Regions:
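Short, low-complexity, charged amphipathic interaction modules
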Residues: 240-283
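Collagenous Gly-X-Y triple-helix signature in extracellular proteins
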Residues: 1-243
């Protein structure tokens, strides 16, 4: 018999359940209804339990995703150098919007229990994984169960429990009007600057231009209690050591990338000098 799923009222109720030590009563696939300024009611689905480590020190977490995207929007608008939008998650309009008016649209008690987490996303411009700290984010291709091949699909996080079986039907979403919809992922198409991964109405992976339209299927992580002044928060710039180490490694890699062209030029010049000296020495030996 199929397990009956439960619908909870608000993120604050989930936080209370965690706080009371009753995490076991929550199940993957359960839904949560929240009030929001984008729509009277938004529906969220539990896709992971203790799958994400919160940067504020929260010991137990529940990861949820929006299953009735309320708006159709672009991933990133056109700008200088990227007339059709850019597929980089970190500077995208989508990420800024999620951390801005979308986050602000929750009731205060629900917003207070959303905790910051660290997310990995491939950067086509830098040709490597970059890390961001977000309270609201989009899911990645690997997190929804698309197989990683280190080419078209990069490792941007383990599949959440809800998507582990690879069932396309679980990726099918309907918008707030009840219509099947495309929805954005944060994963770029790795070989260009404008293509972003999307999931189609059939649940299959696809891609679209960053300036095009898609459903905003936000995700977030709920902690055990409201963030208070005595807890570490991302906003206070006190991220975990691992995150800081990643940032340092990223900065070093950026510096190396900047230096490499000059080093290559110096090596080429040195090779030409050696070649010229060798040629002159050979000429003198013949004399």
């Amino acid at each position: 018999m199929e397990e009956i799923k439960t619908t909870y009222q608000g993120f604050a109720e989930i936080a209370r359940i965690i706080r009371e030590g009753k995490l076991g009563q929550l199940h993957i696939g359960d839904t949560i209804s929240t009030r929001h300024t984008l729509r009277d009611r938004l529906m969220w689905r539990i896709i992971g339990i203790n799958a994400d480590a919160a940067l504020d020190g929260t010991p137990e977490t529940v990861t949820v995703m929006l299953c009735n995207p309320p708006i159709w929007c672009s991933f990133d608008g056109g700008r200088k150098g990227f007339p059709f939008g850019c597929n980089e998650w970190e500077p995208s309009d989508m990420r800024a919007r999620l951390q801005g008016d979308v986050l602000d649209g929750f009731d205060a008690e629900d917003r207070a229990v959303i905790v910051p987490v660290r997310k990995a996303t491939y950067s086509p411009q830098n040709e490597r994984i970059r890390y961001t700290s977000d309270k609201l984010f989009l899911l990645s291709a690997s997190e929804i169960g698309i197989a990683v091949d280190d080419d078209a699909i990069r490792d941007e996080g383990k599949p959440y429990a809800y998507f582990e079986d690879g069932d396309d039907e679980k990726r099918c979403l309907t918008d707030a009007d009840g219509d099947p919809c495309y929805w954005w992922l944060r994963s770029p198409r790795p070989w260009d600057a404008g293509g972003v991964r999307v999931v189609g109405p059939s649940g299959a992976l696809g891609s679209g231009g960053a300036a095009g339209g898609g459903g905003l299927a936000a995700a977030c992580v709920i902690g055990d209690r409201p963030i208070s002044a005595d807890r570490r928060t991302d906003d206070e710039d006190t991220e975990d050591i691992q995150h800081l180490q990643d940032e340092m490694a990223q900065a070093i890699a950026d510096a190396v990338q900047d230096v490499l062209p000059a080093l290559r030029r110096a090596v080429n010049i040195a090779a030409r000098i050696v070649q010229q000296i060798s040629g002159e020495a050979e000429g003198q030996s013949h004399e």
